[in-house]
UniProtKB/Swiss-Prot annotation:
EC number: 3.6.1.-
Keyword flag Hydrolase: yes
Ranges where the CYTH domain occurs: 4-189
Top-level taxon: Bacteria
Top enzyme category: hydrolase
Protein name: Putative triphosphatase YjbK
GO molecular function terms listed in the Swiss-Prot or TrEMBL record: hydrolase activity
Keywords assigned: Hydrolase
């Protein structure tokens, strides 16, 4: 089973802050790649209620089904490779580690349905302390900018992330994860 603990820190950015960081990190357009997240839950938001999220990510022509759920530190991610997914509306969770983990969470996998998609243009830059990720996301007629910092250790990562924000004079902003931002925007459109 492909599982990992994800420790990441996030902060929303203005478009100008995003451009400033990209420039300082010497990131050009060719460093950014497109990926698309397709989100799923039950009509009663059973996953959201458990602070979990289910997505299929299409990146570089490959599809990965990922379940994210809370862990003692960070998030536990369970991954499963998929062959091409052509019918998102009719998608059902295949046998494998993700379905097994959903059952452990007591989620009815037959009730899972497609909620929508979020497209992200992403660049990554490895540093001594962790991975800097710049995301420009588009979903439901909205766009936003975000910086993420992934680290192996929570305390060292937090310290490095705060230093990074200070370096660019960026205030810490409450930042929800992409799926929550997507759901909030979707709720506005209903």
């Amino acid at each position: 089973m492909s599982q990992e603990i994800e420790i990441e820190f996030k902060n929303m950015l203005t478009k100008q802050e995003f451009k400033n960081i990209a420039s300082a990190l010497q990131l050009t357009e060719k460093d950014f790649t497109d990926q698309k997240n397709h989100y799923f839950d039950t009509d009663s938001f059973a996953l959201k209620q458990k602070h979990a999220a289910l997505r299929i990510r299409r990146k570089n022509g490959k599809y990965v089904l990922t379940l994210k759920e809370p862990a003692d530190v960070g998030l536990l991610e369970t991954h499963q490779q998929l062959s091409e997914v052509s019918d998102l509306a009719g998608f059902s969770v295949p046998e494998g580690p993700v379905k097994d983990q959903l059952h452990k969470l007591q989620i009815d996998t037959d009730a899972i349905q497609y909620f929508g998609s979020l497209a992200t243009n992403r660049a990554e830059k490895e540093t001594e302390k962790g991975l800097i990720v710049l995301d420009h996301s588009r979903y439901l007629n909205k766009e936003d900018y975000e910086i993420e910092f992934e680290a192996a250790d929570w305390h060292e990562g937090r310290q490095a992330f705060e230093k990074l924000l200070q370096q660019f004079s960026i205030p810490q902003r409450e930042t929800k994860n992409k799926i929550l931002r997507f759901y909030e925007e979707k709720r506005k459109s209903i």
